[in-house]
């Protein structure tokens, strides 16, 4: 699930961030991206550790571990939306708000399906690492290319289908008072 979701989001909905940035600029705002001076293999490894590995582990432990567990008595959709909203707001970027929210919903369902935050951390790492590695090797993906978007949407549809086809592992009702949480 993790790789399918990460690739689908990056390719299928990556344009959402770019579109939001264009909107902010067209309204007179400024979008400040983070420029990482990845000029050597050592720097790439260091940046992968600091900007891909650590955030993936820490954020997934918090949002899909602690937050998701604290919402275990809530119905599945409101819990997914609350967790995703917290995740999106935490990132503090207006231009990435919608993308991060959708990403958070997907990561929530990965965690619920697997019973662990680890698969979501893998997807999170893949997403963050892809940005760094593509920057390092000089690959620029045209996120507005309809073939790239279509490919990503197909991957996302496959992810949704796989998650939805077997609901037996996903709790859809609030936990009973005497029921022990997983």
PLM region spans:
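Juxtamembrane helix-loop-helix connectors linking adjacent transmembrane helices
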Residues: 1-58, 68, 73
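Hydrophobic alpha-helical transmembrane segments
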Residues: 2-4, 45, 49, 77-85, ...
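Alpha-helical membrane-inserting segments
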Residues: 8-20, 24, 90, 110-114, ...
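C-terminal membrane module of polytopic membrane proteins
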Residues: 19-22, 125-182
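Transmembrane alpha-helical segments in integral membrane proteins
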Residues: 53-70, 157-165
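Active-site His/Glu-centered metal-binding helix of metallohydrolases
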Residues: 57-62, 66-67, 89, 93, ...
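Membrane-interface helix/loop boundary segments of multi-pass membrane proteins
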Residues: 58-82, 109-116
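Functionally important transmembrane alpha-helices
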Residues: 89, 96-152
């Amino acid at each position: 699930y993790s790789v399918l979701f990460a690739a689908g989001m990056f390719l299928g909905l990556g344009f959402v961030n770019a579109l939001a940035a264009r909107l902010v600029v067209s309204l007179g705002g400024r979008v400040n991206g983070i420029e990482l001076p990845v000029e050597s293999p050592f720097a790439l490894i260091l940046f992968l550790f600091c900007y891909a590995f650590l955030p993936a582990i820490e954020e997934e432990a918090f949002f899909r571990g602690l937050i998701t567990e604290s919402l275990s008595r809530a119905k599945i959709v409101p819990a997914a939306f609350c967790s995703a909203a917290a995740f999106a707001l935490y990132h503090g970027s207006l231009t990435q708000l919608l993308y991060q929210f959708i990403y958070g919903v997907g990561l929530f369902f990965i965690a619920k399906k697997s019973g662990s935050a680890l698969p979501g951390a893998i997807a999170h790492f893949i997403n963050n690492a892809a940005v760094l590695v593509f920057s390092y090797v000089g690959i620029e993906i045209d996120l507005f290319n309809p073939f790239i978007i279509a490919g990503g949407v197909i991957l996302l549809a496959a992810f949704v289908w796989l998650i939805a086809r077997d609901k037996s592992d996903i709790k859809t009702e609030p936990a009973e008072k005497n029921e022990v949480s997983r």
